[in-house]
Design a protein with these regions (language model features):
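Sec-dependent bacterial lipoprotein signal peptides
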Residues: 1-19
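Non-catalytic macromolecular-recognition regions in eukaryotic signaling proteins
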Residues: 19-192
């Protein structure tokens, strides 16, 4: 009975997930938060243009409230960011993860404001699954049967401090609705 009880306790301990500190996952003395104030929300796939975020604010926070950085060794240079997409309308086809370069400096315990940074290039909007929404392709998403595609996106920034320690930001998210503004219910009826 004693061995059985020990085995049950060990299984229970192994099954319980451990707590994690996302800000502690990098060796840097800072962590970066992302605040997205204005999101595009609506994207007309009939107009070839990149999807951009009007304003994002990156904020640097020292992990230890008792720490200071008078020499600026915790100043962070952001080199790249990755955008991941997922469907929220029941469909499965999404564009591949997008990786963009950037050269943004975030002072230790300071902020940097990013304006009009892209999250989806024009070439991705003109490819699957968005191309199905264009009139000459039927104007309907084949997976859902709808004239629109609902998608969420996640953005994460990567860089290093002036001291060379890697930094990964928290992940921020948003939502997008893709439609072709030129496709109306009447224009779809004519094609059938």
């Amino acid at each position: 009975m004693k061995k059985f009880l020990i085995a049950v306790v060990l299984v229970a301990v192994a099954a319980v997930p451990a707590c994690t500190n996302k800000q502690g996952e990098t060796e840097a003395p800072v962590f970066i938060t992302v605040n997205i104030q204005l999101q595009p929300g609506f994207v007309d796939v009939g107009t070839p243009a990149p999807v951009q975020i009007q304003t994002m604010v990156l904020s640097s926070h020292l992990k230890s409230s008792a720490a200071s950085d008078p020499q600026g060794f915790a100043t962070t240079t952001i080199n790249t960011y990755i955008v991941h997409f997922r469907r929220t309308d029941g469909g499965t086809r999404v564009p591949p993860d997008q990786t963009f370069g950037c050269g943004v400096t975030v002072p230790s315990n300071g902020t940097a404001t990013l304006s009009n940074f892209p999250i989806l290039p024009v070439s991705a909007i003109q490819a699957a699954p968005f191309d199905q929404l264009l009139p000459f392709n039927g104007g309907v998403d084949r997976e859902t049967g709808k004239t629109e595609i609902h998608m969420a996106w996640d953005i994460t920034f990567f860089g290093q401090t002036a001291a060379g320690q890697r930094v990964q930001s928290e992940t921020a998210s948003g939502g997008l609705l893709f439609v072709d503004a030129a496709v109306t219910p009447e224009s779809r009826k004519v094609k059938r």
